[in-house]
Amino acid sequence: MKSYMAKPNEVERKWYVVDAEGKTLGRLSSEIATILRGKNKPEFTPHVDTGDFVIVVNAEKVALTGKKLDQSFYTYHTGHPGGLRQVSFRRLLAEKPESLVYNAVKGMLPKTRLGRQMLTKLKVYAGPNHKHEAQQPEALELL
């Protein structure tokens, strides 16, 4: 018997809504990355994007343990000479909470073309409202 290999046009995708309120950032992100990759499905195939869509709401209320708010940073470069920048988690949570969750999940996905394709299925919103009601997403309780 041959092993099953999913084909991109055969993959059925679901939509899930995850409430980030009170959830720990790293634990939440690893669960979301698993769903985006499709590793929770029996038809998982490493070279095909078999994952589902994930909508994260209440990103502004995500929890960070310890002193991570002040001691952890995301580093990026503007592309100009001397353009290395760092932003603390506290500042990021205050200004753009969506990017905090987005970057945490991004770091847990493959750094390839397929990983970038998987990341397009992640939708993050700071508040409780989202604009994907037409897709009839299922509420997903993580942890």
Curated annotation (Swiss-Prot):
Q: Name one GO biological process term.
A: negative regulation of translation
Keyword Ribonucleoprotein tagged: yes
Q: Which family does it belong to?
A: Belongs to the universal ribosomal protein uL13 family.
- Explain the purpose of this protein: This protein is one of the early assembly proteins of the 50S ribosomal subunit, although it is not seen to bind rRNA by itself. It is important during the early stages of 50S assembly.
Cross-referenced InterPro entries: Ribosomal_uL13, Ribosomal_uL13_bac-type, Ribosomal_uL13_CS, Ribosomal_uL13_sf
Please describe the quaternary structure of this protein.
Part of the 50S ribosomal subunit.
State the NCBIfam families in the record: rplM_bact
Please give the GO cellular component terms listed in this UniProt entry. cytosolic large ribosomal subunit
| Record key words, sorted | Ribonucleoprotein, Ribosomal protein
Can you name the source organism?
A: Alkaliphilus oremlandii (strain OhILAs)
Gene Ontology molecular-function annotations: mRNA binding; structural constituent of ribosome
The name of this protein is Large ribosomal subunit protein uL13
> Is Ribonucleoprotein tagged as a keyword?
yes
